[in-house]
C-alpha cells in the first residue's frame, strides 16, 4: 500500500469520525431526554392523587400529580423523575411512599407527559424551582420538603438542594456529572467539549447540609455504581446509603428497600 492510499484511508476515517461527532453534537438532547420511552413498571395509582398543572417561568404548564395526605401534614415529598418516560411510570413509587405521613408532589418535565417545551439543563432547573414555589404558595415551607431525585432527577435535586435547607434528600442512581456519564457510554467522543447540559453534581453535592439518602444498584448498567459511591463519599453528614447488588439501573421497591426508607424517615421524624 503506497503512501497516498494510506493518507486517503486516514482522511476517510477521520471524515467518518467527524461526521459521528457532528451528528451526536446536533442530536445530543434527543439522545439524552427521552420523554416517549416506556421502560418502567406499569402499575395503577392506588391513592387519591390529583392531576394538576404547575406553570414554570416560560409559561409552560407542567402536568403533575399531587397527593394530599389525610393527616393534614406539611411534610411533603417532591419527586423529580429521570430522563425517560411519563409520570405514570412512577405510580409504583407513589403507592409505596404514601405510607408515610407526607404529601407527595410528582412533576413531569417540559416536553414530558404531554407537556410543551424542549428540555435543557437550565429548563429542568426552572421546572424544579417552579414546583417548589407551587408548594410554598400552599404554605409548605422548605424545611418541610423532602426532595427525591431519580437518575437524571438527582442532578436537578442536587442543584436546588444546595441552595436551601430541605428536610431531607433522596437520590436514586445519582451520577457524578453528565460529562462522566457520557464518557461511560461514548468513550470515543470528546464529550467534555461537546455537551451542552453538563449537570456537574459532583461539584455541588458538598454544598448540601440536609440529611441525605443515596440508593444505587451495584449492577447498574446505565449509571455505573462507582458514580453513586463517589457521590456518597462526597456528601456531607448526616448521610445514609442503600447499595444493593441484585438490581440494575433503578432499585426495586421491595421489603429491603422499604426497611431502609423506614430508617431514613425515622431520622427525618416524618411520622411524629
Located regions from the model:
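Membrane-embedded segments
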Residues: 57-134, 150, 154-155, 161
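Short alpha-helix in the alpha/beta-hydrolase fold that links the catalytic acid
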Residues: 93, 201, 210, 224-233
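Alpha/beta-hydrolase fold nucleophile elbow
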Residues: 139-151
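Hydrolase active-site cap/lid region
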Residues: 154-210
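C-terminal catalytic histidine-bearing segment of alpha/beta-hydrolase fold enzymes
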Residues: 230-233, 237-272
Amino acid at each position: 500500500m503506497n503512501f497516498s492510499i494510506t493518507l486517503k484511508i486516514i482522511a476517510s476515517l477521520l471524515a467518518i469520525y467527524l461526521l459521528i461527532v457532528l451528528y451526536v453534537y446536533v442530536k445530543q438532547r434527543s439522545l439524552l431526554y427521552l420523554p416517549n420511552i416506556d421502560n418502567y413498571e406499569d402499575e395503577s395509582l392506588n391513592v387519591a392523587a390529583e392531576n394538576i398543572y404547575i406553570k414554570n417561568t416560560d409559561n409552560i404548564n407542567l402536568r403533575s400529580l399531587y397527593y394530599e395526605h389525610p393527616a393534614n401534614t406539611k411534610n411533603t415529598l417532591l419527586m423529580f423523575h429521570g430522563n425517560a418516560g411519563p409520570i405514570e411510570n412512577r405510580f409504583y413509587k407513589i403507592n409505596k411512599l404514601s405510607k408515610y405521613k407526607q404529601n407527595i408532589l410528582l412533576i413531569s418535565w417540559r416536553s414530558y407527559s404531554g407537556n410543551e417545551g424542549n428540555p435543557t439543563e437550565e429548563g429542568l432547573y426552572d421546572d424544579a424551582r417552579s414546583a417548589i414555589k407551587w408548594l410554598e404558595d400552599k404554605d409548605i415551607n422548605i424545611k418541610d420538603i423532602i426532595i427525591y431525585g431519580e437518575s437524571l432527577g438527582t442532578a436537578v435535586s442536587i442543584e436546588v438542594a444546595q441552595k436551601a435547607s430541605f428536610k431531607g434528600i433522596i437520590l436514586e442512581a445519582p451520577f457524578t456529572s453528565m460529562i462522566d456519564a457520557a464518557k461511560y457510554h461514548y468513550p470515543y467522543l470528546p464529550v467534555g467539549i461537546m455537551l451542552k447540559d453538563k449537570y456537574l453534581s459532583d461539584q455541588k453535592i458538598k454544598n448540601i447540609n440536609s440529611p441525605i439518602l443515596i440508593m444505587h444498584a451495584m449492577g447498574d448498567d446505565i449509571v455505573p455504581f462507582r458514580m453513586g459511591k463517589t457521590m456518597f463519599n462526597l456528601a456531607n453528614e448526616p448521610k445514609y446509603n442503600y447499595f444493593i447488588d441484585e438490581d440494575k439501573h433503578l432499585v426495586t421497591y421491595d421489603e429491603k428497600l422499604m426497611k431502609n426508607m423506614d430508617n431514613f424517615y425515622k431520622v427525618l421524624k416524618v411520622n411524629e
